[in-house]
UniProtKB/Swiss-Prot annotation:
Keywords: ATP-binding, Brassinosteroid signaling pathway, Cell membrane, Glycoprotein, Kinase, Leucine-rich repeat, Membrane, Nucleotide-binding, Receptor, Repeat, Serine/threonine-protein kinase, Signal, Transferase, Transmembrane, Transmembrane helix
Presence of the UniProt keyword Transmembrane helix in the record: yes
Function in brief: May be involved in brassenosteroid (BR) perception.
Residues covered by the Protein kinase domain: 824-1101
Protein name (record): Brassinosteroid LRR receptor kinase BRL2
The species this protein was found in: Oryza sativa subsp. japonica
Entry-linked SUPFAM superfamilies: L domain-like, Protein kinase-like (PK-like), RNI-like
Glycosylation sites: 94, 139, 149, 172, 214, 269, 293, 305, 378, 450, 485, 498, 627, 662, 675
GO molecular function: ATP binding; protein serine kinase activity; protein serine/threonine kinase activity; signaling receptor activity
Transmembrane segment boundaries: 741-761
Binding site for brassinolide: Y580
Amino acid sequence: MDILIPLLLSSIYVSSSAAAAETDAAALLRFKAFVHKDPRGVLSSWVDPGPCRWRGVTCNGDGRVTELDLAAGGLAGRAELAALSGLDTLCRLNLSGNGELHVDAGDLVKLPRALLQLDLSDGGLAGRLPDGFLACYPNLTDVSLARNNLTGELPGMLLASNIRSFDVSGNNMSGDISGVSLPATLAVLDLSGNRFTGAIPPSLSGCAGLTTLNLSYNGLAGAIPEGIGAIAGLEVLDVSWNHLTGAIPPGLGRNACASLRVLRVSSNNISGSIPESLSSCHALRLLDVANNNVSGGIPAAVLGNLTAVESLLLSNNFISGSLPDTIAHCKNLRVADLSSNKISGALPAELCSPGAALEELRLPDNLVAGTIPPGLSNCSRLRVIDFSINYLRGPIPPELGRLRALEKLVMWFNGLDGRIPADLGQCRNLRTLILNNNFIGGDIPVELFNCTGLEWVSLTSNQITGTIRPEFGRLSRLAVLQLANNSLAGEIPRELGNCSSLMWLDLNSNRLTGEIPRRLGRQLGSTPLSGILSGNTLAFVRNVGNSCKGVGGLLEFAGIRPERLLQVPTLKSCDFTRLYSGAAVSGWTRYQTLEYLDLSYNSLDGEIPEELGDMVVLQVLDLARNNLTGEIPASLGRLRNLGVFDVSRNRLQGGIPDSFSNLSFLVQIDISDNNLSGEIPQRGQLSTLPASQYAGNPGLCGMPLEPCGDRLPTATMSGLAAAASTDPPPRRAVATWANGVILAVLVSAGLACAAAIWAVAARARRREVRSAMMLSSLQDGTRTATTWKLGKAEKEALSINVATFQRQLRKLTFTQLIEATNGFSTASLIGSGGFGEVFKATLKDGSCVAIKKLIHLSYQGDREFMAEMETLGKIKHKNLVPLLGYCKIGEERLLVYEFMSHGSLEDTLHGDGGRSASPAMSWEQRKKVARGAARGLCFLHYNCIPHIIHRDMKSSNVLLDGDMEARVADFGMARLISALDTHLSVSTLAGTPGYVPPEYYQSFRCTVKGDVYSFGVVLLELLTGRRPTDKDDFGDTNLVGWVKMKVGDGAGKEVLDPELVVEGADADEMARFMDMALQCVDDFPSKRPNMLQVVAMLRELDAPPPATAI
């Protein structure tokens, strides 16, 4: 009997264990049922009844499931967490890295209560975190929900928990975290990459075991709490990219400093100086204080004691004084970036000691003087040297040739002289050599071409002599070659055609002769451009007018404040605008042909090669001030991306090819001072450009010059000359005949004048009566849509002319505007917005214009209004609604615009009911509208002087002309209103709900990246057919949040407008279109593309895939 009882109990135990294992297997199979895709066969073994042998499953000694790890399995479908609730022994759950495995955040409360560790990072988790979900799991210590699409707030979630590690980085969570209470057990807290606001929680000082604190990329404000310095074991402190103020707490250099390895406070508004107490941080490897307002000198003691530091990032501050010699003590220092400060004095002679680890030395945009120390060659690992915009003088030390690892040597705008050292040819890894704007002379050493990996060579504005060496043809990776403004002579070597990666060629202002090589436009594109120019920050400084030669220049702009350009003497004399900055142009890696070609200010002769028309992405072509002959090739009309075309001051003949009408991106053309003839093509943009750009061609006619019909034909002129040369009749007969004619003419003229005077007087009386009636109705307000403010003095001004920018409206008066709108009646009202009401006016000749009546403001005066009008009136582009004129009378301000017959995109897309209007816009039409609106906004950002931030980009400000071409409207309005009214809050000028970027709610500081966000919302409207705000559709969120949530859930197709046919190539285009739109509406401005990049992406949307070699 004693033996039977244990056997019976054992049998019962085995039976219950087996039953429990079967329950675990059933739970896992229920979970598997919701997984629709398993491309890697992760769950293929989940078939036999024993779950402990299944992949990703770990069991205890009793055969119960304790761990489920399906990380990076490529699973797709839905993670049904409720199915796992029966796994009551499950301690660890890892579903990370399954981006298409969607998890409802609300299900986080349905997991087994025994859970210790939870990792759902990099997955499809979306929604709000349930209140108190951590309290459901008393043993839970480690939670990682990073890089998902979580929303909602954090406060209260960490209460009553034993959490040791909590990571919700890279989500869309928000709310004020100032008052959140944190558990004393906390060791790792990562809230980075969200939208949290408020101050850094003071409760952090109670987390004595905290080792990692990452609050970067949020909207936190206030000072860094002094109490953080009391956390003895803190290893990582990252509060970068917030709005923090105050100084770096000196307390960080006390208790916390003993273990601190990473200190990041960059991209805030931190002030004060670098505390000397940081000299105690012997373990510090990364010190990042960049992009703040830190001032004072670099404490010598700090650099002398940070022997473990590897990265010293102090750029973009106001740090002054000289660079301490003690930097040589930082034996482990790999990256030293002190860009954009006020560091002065000479570089320490012992900056580099033998065996130093230094790889990057960046000191651009400072006040460093003296010579370059030859001892830099001791830093044998140096890859990057950047000393741009300083006061260095003397020659480049030939000892730099010993730096065999050197990849970038950038020293533009200094006072360097001497020659380019031939020893640099030993730097076989050299990719970038930028020495422009110095006093370097001599020829280009042939040894330099041993550096066959060169990608960017810029020697512009020096005193280089000799010829352009044919050895440049060896450089198959050469993408940028700038040799402008030197004394180079001879011919352009045809071997440049072998530079199969060449994108940017600027040889302007030299003494070059001969013809333009035909191979230049024909031999490009045979080498893939992968990796070329990667890591470079580019800026194109474009010259305006003729104060400086050439179109402009491409600069390496990393670590340089844009305003510093204004202080560069050689640039200060130029009228310039910074046209483009950012990463390498995306089109380069796709098409592999020249984008920029400037050969102006030379002595080139011969004809313009037809082959230049094969450069499909060419944006700038400047051949001005040469001795070119022949005709402008019609093939250049194939350059659909061409923005600048200048062939002025040559000897060209013939006409302007009609193919130029297709150049929709053209914003500047100058063909003046040639021998061209014929009519200027009236299609496209050529007729809208200034007449001065066609001057000096006596044979040219048509808008914007005199109409061709106004010129007498040659035969007529010959006939008049012949008549003038015939013999006169006898004198007496002529006198008798003339007397009779004169008498008749005088009598007729007198009668005609009397009749005309009577008619004019009668017409004036009728007009006066009509004007008085109109004025009365305007002031009564009974027939009008608005309230008018006209004093008695303005009654006499109803005949005032409208100041116009178009010839056909030269004689338009205010009275005619009243008549054309029936007294600005409600029937003529076609729209209203934040800046005023818009009326349709039908003029006497049947043409229509749109009239915007600005809101009444406390105007500062007429000068500001007229100055803004003159600026806006000169802005002309195919994709902008042109301002035709303006009228000022009393307190009224009227703007006259070209009328857009198809109304706004908002009306066309949404109609009156909030859904797509009928007939629905096709996908091709939507793409066309997106491209046009992008070009218009891009023009405002980069081509207008001064640049214009729209501030209210939305679908109602995208108008459609008769050809359904998009025109951006209301540009410049926010700036005009703010210039006229001193009492208008900036917040009222910052956009329309649904289009306003999140950063505007924090600072109200409008930027071009804010416009990009608003444009991204317009793209989402085109894609979804939905308005940006609709409580029925989106509840408490908006279109942007709704689309992000759907895409995060893997349901991106559900957001597409039902009116669109999604199939074939269109489906792929829509996916790319959505990806581009989501880039535009990224919460972080720095992650959004600029409009130049958006235009390029839209252009590539329709581009055929690049041809492959056979």
